[in-house]
């Protein structure tokens, strides 16, 4: 049986569209997870909240939530495999990555999610654990990020045009999950795209601001800027 934890979040919703799970858990029923007794083939963990601003504003609350999740899942029957959906932010910002995790974390959101990765490995020592790290996301299920704000004209004036993000289309998630399970790669970081380029091409009327530089540029790239922009264009056109 395959089990999904985090079934109502963004990634969880995408996974449920692509695959049938024998059991699904979310924040309202996660306390029932330890009651599961059936053998688990694969355990998919998409349960860490993605609200970076909230985690950075209250990192201790974020840590406590993470610990609560671990306590609820650690008593599950030992699965053959565990797949953890994590974030580019474990690497920090403004550096080209070609090796390990930095010793000093740039932000608490990333630090807590790296700790979560390690706690999962410790909790399931007899399982094969695959960590899948993703950057900024776009999909019809998104509820909050720069693209969502531009599409819904929400707090556009707070968007920092002096930024570059690596964007990933969640339509590829299940295909790439299978790649990660097979050992091909586990980090899906396309080439970075300047926010200014996105606004110039798709939202030329947006009245944005400019602040301190924010840049994500972590390789090795799994898609070109052109490939990502084509997918982003299709996503934006479908949204409208």
What is the predicted role of each segment?
Residues 174-219, 223-240:
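Mid/C-terminal beta-alpha module of Rossmann-like enzyme folds, strongest
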Residues 21-37, 46, 209-211:
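A short beta-strand-loop structural module common to alpha/beta enzyme folds
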Residues 45, 82-84, 130-136:
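Structural signature of the Rossmann-like NAD(P)-dependent dehydrogenase/reductase core
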Residues 1-25:
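N-terminal Rossmann NAD(P)H-binding glycine-rich loop of SDR-like oxidoreductase domains
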